[in-house]
Every structure is written in structure tokens, then in C-alpha cells.
């Protein structure tokens, strides 16, 4: 049986997807292949605790530990979503000692697309 060789990824992309209910942090190579990920739910939080910024920070730290095993040194951060944990997750990655190439907000915004649900219309 052949010995499994661990992939080395010196440069990567950190994707932070923050929703009102959860925060998902994943690390991919430059082609987009995910090699490490974590989320607020995956680290053990359930229900309303998943959406807290503290849980998002722990999810980012857990994903960072997995990503550092692959030799990650330089990262671009892509933030998507409107949840409360996106800033905390970003700060956790910035404080980790990795070289940050760029921080970009890639939240999709409609150019007057479909009609939003009733609860969002009430807020407007």
C-alpha cells in the first residue's frame, strides 16, 4: 500500500460565509479546492449560540489549525454575508500570523432581482 503524501499549500484563499444563523470558514487553494474548513455548528455549538461572534472566532481558529497543517503561509480573505460573526472570524485569521494579501467583501447584492420575502419588506 502506498504511503499517503500530505498536500502542501503555501498560498490559499480563506472564505468566510456569515449568515444570521451560522458562520462557515473554509480554506482553499488558488484553484478553489477546499482543504480545511470549520463552522460554528461543527465545533459543537447548537441553536442560538451558533450565530454569536464568539462561536465564529472559534470556528475560524479551528479551520486555521487544520489549514496550518498543510503549510499555509499566505492567504487572501473573501468575506460573504451579513451575519454577526464575519468581523470576528476575519480578525482571528489576521491575528494568526499568516501573510494577508487582500481582504475582499464578495457579498452578492441584487440589482433589483426577485421580490424579497415579506419579513424583509417589513424592515425596509
UniProtKB/Swiss-Prot annotation:
Residue ranges, annotated region (Disordered): 102-124
Signal peptide stretch: none
SUPFAM superfamilies: Translational machinery components
GO molecular function: rRNA binding; structural constituent of ribosome
GO cellular component: ribonucleoprotein complex; ribosome
Keywords: Ribonucleoprotein, Ribosomal protein, RNA-binding, rRNA-binding
Keyword Ribonucleoprotein: yes
Record InterPro entries: Ribosomal_uS11, Ribosomal_uS11_bac-type, Ribosomal_uS11_CS, Ribosomal_uS11_sf
GO terms (BP aspect): translation
Oligomer status and interactors: Part of the 30S ribosomal subunit. Interacts with proteins S7 and S18. Binds to IF-3.
Protein task: Located on the platform of the 30S subunit, it bridges several disparate RNA helices of the 16S rRNA. Forms part of the Shine-Dalgarno cleft in the 70S ribosome.
HAMAP family reported for this sequence: Ribosomal_uS11 (MF_01310)
Family: Belongs to the universal ribosomal protein uS11 family.
Listed PANTHER family: 40S RIBOSOMAL PROTEIN S14/30S RIBOSOMAL PROTEIN S11
Protein name: Small ribosomal subunit protein uS11
Originating organism: Metamycoplasma arthritidis (strain 158L3-1)
Gene name of the record: rpsK
Amino acid at each position: 500500500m502506498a504511503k499517503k503524501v500530505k498536500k502542501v499549500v503555501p498560498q490559499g484563499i480563506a472564505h468566510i460565509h456569515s449568515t444570521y444563523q451560522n458562520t462557515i470558514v473554509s480554506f482553499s487553494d488558488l484553484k478553489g479546492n477546499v482543504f480545511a474548513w470549520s463552522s460554528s455548528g461543527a465545533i459543537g455549538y447548537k441553536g442560538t449560540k451558533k450565530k454569536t461572534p464568539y462561536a465564529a472566532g472559534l470556528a475560524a481558529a479551528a479551520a486555521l489549525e487544520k489549514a496550518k497543517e498543510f503549510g499555509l503561509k499566505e492567504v487572501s480573505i473573501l468575506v460573504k454575508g451579513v451575519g454577526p460573526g464575519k468581523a470576528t472570524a476575519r480578525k482571528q485569521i489576521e491575528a494568526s500570523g499568516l501573510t494577508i494579501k487582500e481582504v475582499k467583501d464578495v457579498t452578492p447584492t441584487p440589482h433589483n432581482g426577485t421580490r424579497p420575502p415579506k419579513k424583509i419588506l417589513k424592515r425596509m
